[in-house]
Amino acid sequence: MIREVVEAAGHQVVFAKALPLDKKVLSTIMQRMADGQMADLILTTGGAGLAQADCTPEATLEIVDREIRGIPEAMRAHMMTLTKRSMLNRAAAGVRNHVMIVNLPGKAGAVKECLEYLLPEIIHGVEVIKGEI
């Protein structure tokens, strides 16, 4: 679902892979991608709920230099108009080495809804981080 929405908005997906819910694996991959500047934006999906195995926000916050609290706040606020269970989402967002990292929900419909709502502002943020604006 991420690929479809991102490409429909005119952007390129350079890496997509299902990863295990393992904090060390997730943080290592995100860190390598950001430090290698493989992409301007890293989007994750899933692993931000309340299940014991959910660790994506912790993996993200462990590696970012600066947190961007407004993105997950806006995502939760928007999704609350559709389901109150959105308040249970623990997504995080931040910046590492001029690369933005954003955690998205795990369900395809929620990913689509969030990206369509947030992507213009996320792209603006990426441009600011890159010094393009």
Question: Which residue stretches match the model-derived regions?
Answer:
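Non-catalytic beta/alpha edge segments that cap or flank active sites
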Residues: 1-133
